[in-house]
């Protein structure tokens, strides 16, 4: 399994264990209650070196809620980052969150009849094969 997939699975599992509603692959059904977490896209920048595989990956995490939930969304974004920092290793890889390369944004979304807000976290993670 790739470093990207192992991190994704570890993050999803950890967020669900904390009691968050977490979705991936497809957005949740239309009447899903807010707030919820959506594990969106990810990408990998591997490097091959003599001593093993290393690289950096990026995982996008979105927190969706109504416009009145801005504080909750902000707190959940911080919880996502804190949770990601606890993922130190999986069966195959060791991980380190690159906090100085991680970005968080709170964005308005007016594509529905209900004004929404999206917390957008771009986690940047260094990894190496154990």
Whereabouts are the PLM-identified features?
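Acidic-leaning, charged glycine-interspersed low-complexity segments
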Residues: 84-128
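Oligomerization/assembly interface segments of phage tail-like spikes and tubes
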Residues: 53-67, 117-127
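Short hydrophobic/aromatic patches at helix-to-coil boundaries
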Residues: 3-4, 126-130
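Short, polar/acidic, helix-capping and beta-turn segments at strand->helix junctions
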Residues: 31-34, 46-50, 54-57, 113-115, ...
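Mid-chain, well-packed structural core segment of small domains
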Residues: 66-89
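Small/polar-rich, solvent-exposed N-terminal microdomains that initiate assembly or binding
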Residues: 1-51, 78, 87-92
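Short beta-turn/strand-loop junction motif enriched in small, turn-promoting residues
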Residues: 44-46, 66, 109
């Amino acid at each position: 399994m790739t470093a990207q997939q192992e991190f994704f699975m570890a993050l999803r599992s950890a967020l669900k264990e904390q009691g968050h509603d977490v979705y991936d692959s497809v957005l949740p059904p239309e009447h899903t209650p807010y707030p919820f977490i959506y594990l969106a896209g990810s990408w990998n920048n591997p490097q091959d070196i003599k001593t093993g595989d290393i690289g950096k990956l990026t995982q996008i995490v979105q927190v969706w809620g109504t416009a009145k939930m801005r504080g909750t969304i902000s707190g959940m974004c911080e919880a996502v980052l804190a949770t990601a920092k606890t993922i130190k290793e999986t069966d195959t890889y060791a991980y380190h969150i690159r906090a100085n390369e991680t970005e968080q944004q709170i964005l308005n979304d007016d594509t529905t009849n209900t004004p929404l807000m999206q917390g957008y976290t771009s986690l940047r993670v260094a990894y190496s094969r154990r």
